[in-house]
Amino acid sequence: MCGIAGQVGRDPRTIQRRYAAYCAMQQTLARRGPDQRGMYICGAAALIHARLAVVDLENGLQPMQLDWQGETYVLVYNGELYNTPELRAALVARGHSFNGHSDTEVLLHAFAEWGANCVPRCNGIFAFAVWQQNAGTLFLARDRCGVKPLFYTQAEDSLIFGSELKTLLAHPAVPPRVDANGLAEVLLLGPGRTPGCGVFQNVRELLPGQYACLLYTSPSPRDS
């Protein structure tokens, strides 16, 4: 079990001044990823990871970066792929090479090769985010069964996401405010909740099998 989080916005200055917030968000993920922590802050994007190291301890560090065909891809990922060998073989046939044997690296190359079409190719449980540095786009995806959680909200003219609700609430731009719908979720459905509901005001959950492409601040969720 790992944890991911991040913020991507229109104005790089917003991202650059929020380092303390990112450290606080990362701290909320400590129980999910006690072994290693990583952070990527560049331009209008910040990606955060807390890792439970299971496979390829040296070469599986995140955020993981790949330069491929003129684009720079940065990945944070929580999950496990069950068809890693098959994906790796298909990617090697297309000219990709690998530094290690982690499924993280395979997923990153898969996105670089197939984009959003990599999601239906992945057999596993996952939630991940990929930042395309040159294109200025963020991609979020979640597995079909929704085993791995992923929440998001819009604030500061940006998108803020994380593996847990408390991760988002650690950001000062996300107030812990529960509206009428959220209160109904807690009182009538708790400890369960409606799929997609984040309980807190303006907080949503990416649905199982859904992905979202974000250019600047216009997220467009789609079902895979």
Model-derived segments and spans:
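Cysteine-centered catalytic environments shared across enzyme families
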Residues: M1-S218
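A short, hydrophobic C-terminal helix/tail in secreted or cell-surface proteins
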Residues: P219-S224
